[in-house]
């Protein structure tokens, strides 16, 4: 499936991608410049373009955008050789909705950023642990565990370079890493697991091939499915693999070339939903030998280095990315024949942004660059924005101090603040290093400035599916909402682990009785933060618990 009408594939050294309107992007994976010609089929519109050599680091390909006048398919030639024909899907670049205006109110409206504090590494990979500490690693140096309470770091060495690996949390709370770094676009087959209770790494049986930039997603069974990436030889790995806790199973019926770090989610039907970065979205069935089925096309074109998040069970927001867009769109996988729909646009176009779920059910966007090149650091976006799922409207919040683009990360902490860190550990297309941001900032959202917070004085540590749990709180009558958020695991503009759901509850004189999910599809086994909120949407500190 897909709009390609020539033999071009995602492994081709020169590719064409459709964006929106009459806009295309040409990619060159050759280590040398290539002169190409292009033509809009069915018209006399044509031109020539020199594609820069692929950079040695960062993206592994050079990119140039072409905007044409006519609405036909774009054909790309090298000499007399036809390289690719890319159809023009004729979709709009912007939805017909307004953009927000900047509020100049105080912290109770726009929130507040901390000063940037030093970190020992560039935190390209960021994970919340069971005790509220944070595990991070980059391209260089040992993985570090940061203690927010003491603002201290402890290194924990591992036998693999975990840079550009994929990761997820297991049902027992292990931070599971798959793949890693040999060199740019060449991945390790290694499988490693960090036990936060003992602070130790364990090496597990390796995958069949290396993977650099894969995505790891937990299934309802607690098994992990690994999709995408490039192997030891720089060849795209087309066959997904499933880890059952002791061994690997190849999904030989699901061969497909996918972009780096596919935006994958566990869908309500138990399959894996691939939301992008490509325009066409699909389901991956993991039973037997596996298989792909088409769901439909997004409204905007390729959203490379955009952010995607499951903001409610089965409902996904995809925002930013591409060259470069402020648009956002959603899909509801709970309905028959799901289709993508426009929602409100951000105030600023962004790529390399991070999207973080908040206890209020909103989605916070931080960082990124509005430039049209791969990582235009001179065009960094500092204004945070928050999306309201009920209205589809974005609101501008306070601005941070540090430019955070490629390799920046963000996660929600139990106290309701958002850790924003990383950016760098890469070189640009001219061989110059991007600034390495070995520091972290903390964002306190507006809800932390709206008065006293509800408190959880006790709650079960390891409740079962479908249980009604007693959550003690001093003023149960003040509690208006209860929500559950899976603890985060972020890298490369995507948190593959976070998901949010509202919970039903009743009140007693001393507690709220909260009904937990019954479905392992809606809430895969593992660790979550439970929040209770008052009528002003002020959340408690999250209580980390294991759902099993």
Language model regions located:
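Short, compositionally biased P/S/T/A/G/V-rich stretches that sit at domain boundaries
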Residues: 1-17, 446-461
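Edge beta-strands of extracellular beta-sandwich domains
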Residues: 2, 80-98, 539-546
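Short beta-strand/loop motifs in extracellular/secreted proteins, especially
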Residues: 22, 32-37, 72, 478-480
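Asparagine-centered strand-capping/turn motif at beta-strand->loop junctions
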Residues: 26-30
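Extracellular Ig-like/FN3 beta-sandwich strand-entry sites
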Residues: 31-33, 69-73, 525-527
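Intrinsically disordered, low-complexity Pro/Gly/Ser/Thr-rich segments with frequent PxxP/GP/PP motifs
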Residues: 44-71
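Conserved structural position at the C-terminal beta-strand
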Residues: 76-78, 532
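Kelch-like beta-propeller repeat domains
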Residues: 98-548
């Amino acid at each position: 499936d897909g709009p390609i009408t020539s033999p071009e594939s995602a492994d081709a050294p020169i590719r064409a991608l459709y964006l929106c309107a009459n806009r295309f992007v040409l990619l060159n994976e050759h280590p040398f410049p290539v002169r190409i010609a292009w033509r809009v089929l069915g018209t006399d519109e044509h031109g020539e373009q020199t594609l820069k050599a692929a950079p040695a680091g960062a993206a592994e390909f050079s990119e140039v955008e072409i905007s044409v006048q006519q609405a036909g398919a774009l054909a790309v030639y090298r000499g007399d050789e036809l390289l690719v024909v890319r159809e023009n899907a004729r979709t709009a670049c912007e939805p017909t909705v307004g953009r927000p205006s900047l509020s100049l109110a105080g912290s109770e409206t726009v929130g507040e950023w901390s000063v940037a504090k030093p970190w020992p590494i560039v935190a390209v990979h960021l994970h919340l642990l069971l005790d509220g500490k944070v595990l991070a690693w980059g391209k260089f140096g040992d993985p570090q565990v940061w203690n927010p309470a003491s603002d201290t770091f402890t290194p924990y060495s591992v036998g693999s370079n975990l840079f550009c690996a994929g990761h997820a949390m297991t049902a027992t709370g292990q931070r599971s890493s798959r793949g890693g770094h040999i060199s740019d676009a060449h991945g390790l087959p290694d499988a490693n697991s960090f036990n936060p209770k003992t602070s130790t790494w364990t090496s597990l049986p390796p995958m069949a091939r290396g993977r650099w930039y894969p995505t790891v997603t937990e299934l309802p069974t607690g098994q992990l499915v690994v999709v995408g990436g490039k192997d030891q030889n720089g060849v795209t790995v087309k066959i997904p693999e499933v880890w059952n806790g002791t061994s690997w199973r190849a999904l030989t019926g699901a061969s497909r070339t996918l972009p780096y770090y596919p935006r994958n989610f566990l869908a309500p039907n138990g399959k894996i939903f691939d939301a992008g970065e490509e325009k066409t979205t699909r389901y991956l069935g993991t039973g037997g030998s596996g298989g792909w089925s088409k769901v439909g096309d997004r409204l905007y074109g390729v959203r490379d280095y955009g952010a995607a998040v499951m903001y409610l069970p089965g409902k996904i927001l995809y925002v930013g990315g591409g060259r470069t867009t402020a648009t956002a769109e959603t899909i509801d996988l709970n309905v028959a024949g799901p289709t993508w729909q426009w929602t409100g646009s951000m105030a600023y176009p962004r790529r390399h942004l991070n999207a973080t779920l908040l206890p209020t059910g909103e989605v916070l966007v931080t960082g990124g660059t509005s430039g049209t090149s791969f990582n235009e650091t001179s065009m960094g976006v500092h204004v945070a924005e928050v999306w309201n799922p009920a209205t589809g409207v974005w609101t501008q919040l306070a601005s941070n101090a540090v430019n955070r683009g490629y390799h920046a990360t963000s996660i929600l902490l139990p106290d309701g603040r958002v850790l924003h860190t990383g950016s760098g550990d890469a070189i640009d297309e001219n061989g110059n290093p991007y600034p390495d941001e070995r520091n972290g900032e903390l964002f306190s959202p507006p809800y932390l400035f709206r008065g006293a917070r509800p408190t959880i004085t006790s709650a079960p540590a390891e409740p079962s599916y479908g249980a009604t749990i007693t959550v003690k709180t001093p003023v149960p009558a003040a509690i208006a909402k209860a929500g559950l958020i899976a603890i985060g695991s972020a890298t490369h503009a995507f948190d593959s682990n976070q998901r949010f759901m509202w919970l039903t509850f009743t009140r007693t004189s001393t507690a709220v009785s909260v009904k937990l999910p019954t479905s392992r599809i809606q809430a895969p086994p593992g660790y979550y933060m439970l929040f209770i909120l008052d009528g002003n949407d002020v959340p408690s500190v999250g209580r980390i618990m294991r759902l099993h």
